């Protein structure tokens, strides 16, 4: 069984390979080309942003130095602060606390997973 953090990294590799072979793609195209679900794409984007490998311009993602540090990095910082004080929380609770949508939460979790700052558990 693969742990979720490892899964995020594998999915990030899948997104990277897809962008490397196909060029710039929208989120919908990334989902179609990779076969990943939305949450998995968002976490992979966060992981790649932390690695400074992905950028988004006019709704298209491509491989390049990231321009997502402010957006994803700030959300990751907020989540890190909350988890440091509150302990274990689910994504719905985190979303309510920082007033961000699911896309933002999963991107930030991908960022934090790449930094090895969090442990994720899959719920049923």
Q: Over which residues does each language-model region extend?
A:
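Short alpha-helical segments that sit at the start of domains
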Residues: 1-14, 55-80, 107
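Short amphipathic alpha-helical interface segments
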Residues: 7-33, 72-97
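A local structural micro-motif
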Residues: 27, 39, 56-57, 91, ...
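Short loop/turn and capping residues at structural boundaries
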Residues: 30, 42, 58-60, 94, ...
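Short amphipathic alpha-helical interaction segments
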Residues: 36-47, 100-111
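A short, conserved structural fragment
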Residues: 49-59, 113-124
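Long, charge-rich, low-complexity alpha-helical segments
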Residues: 97-98, 121
């Amino acid at each position: 069984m693969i742990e979720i953090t490892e899964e995020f990294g594998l999915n990030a590799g899948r997104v990277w390979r897809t962008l490397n072979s196909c060029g710039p793609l929208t989120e919908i195209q990334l989902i179609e080309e990779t076969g990943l679900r939305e949450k998995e794409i968002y976490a992979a984007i966060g992981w790649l942003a932390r690695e400074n490998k992905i950028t988004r311009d006019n709704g298209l993602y491509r491989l390049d130095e990231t321009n997502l540090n402010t957006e994803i990095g700030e959300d990751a910082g907020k989540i890190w602060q909350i988890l440091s004080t509150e302990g274990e929380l689910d994504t719905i609770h985190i979303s309510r606390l920082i007033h961000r949508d699911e896309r933002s939460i999963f991107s930030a979790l991908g960022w934090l997973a790449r930094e090895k700052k969090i442990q994720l558990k899959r719920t049923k």
